[in-house]
Amino acid sequence: MSITKDQIIEAVSAMSVMDVVELISAMEEKFGVSAAAAVAVAAAGPAEAAEEKTEFDVILKAAGANKVAVIKAVRGATGLGLKEAKDLVESAPAALKEGVSKDDAEALKKSLEEAGAEVEVK
């Protein structure tokens, strides 16, 4: 019996952010590919016709000099535990939040930059 796409999607949606990061790393090793390359190819696709973007992704590019403050800010923003937040900060660049409003994304970016992190909103 094989697993369906819906079952895989359901299993991944129940995972924590850190589990998904580990899954992606394992898949990159197993298949000899890079998820970053897939994102670059997808971004190079045809642009949407002047439609204003309503959902944004907040990407932690680098922790900066004050990693402890950044970990605290990540914990506050995501609700992750200490270990998960630390692992996420150390695995930068990493997506912190996806599909958030522009106001929420900008507020999160501001709080993380005040803690010393390098953040990008896409």
Swiss-Prot record:
GO MF terms listed in the record are: mRNA binding; structural constituent of ribosome
Superkingdom, according to UniProt?
A: Bacteria
- Record's keyword terms, sorted: Ribonucleoprotein, Ribosomal protein
InterPro entries this protein is in?
Ribosomal_bL12, Ribosomal_bL12_C, Ribosomal_bL12_C/ClpS-like, Ribosomal_bL12_oligo, Ribosomal_bL12_oligo_N_sf
The keyword Nucleotide-binding appears for this protein: no
For this chain's UniProt record, which GO biological process terms are given? translation
| A GO term from the CC aspect | cytosolic large ribosomal subunit
Q: One Pfam annotation, family name? A: Ribosomal_L12_N
Q: Which PANTHER family match?
A: 39S RIBOSOMAL PROTEIN L12, LARGE RIBOSOMAL SUBUNIT PROTEIN BL12M
Reported function: Forms part of the ribosomal stalk which helps the ribosome interact with GTP-bound translation factors. Is thus essential for accurate translation.
- State the family named in the UniProt similarity comment for this chain: Belongs to the bacterial ribosomal protein bL12 family.
Q: How would you summarize the oligomeric state and partners of this protein?
A: Homodimer. Part of the ribosomal stalk of the 50S ribosomal subunit. Forms a multimeric L10(L12)X complex, where L10 forms an elongated spine to which 2 to 4 L12 dimers bind in a sequential fashion. Binds GTP-bound translation factors.
Name of this protein: Large ribosomal subunit protein bL12
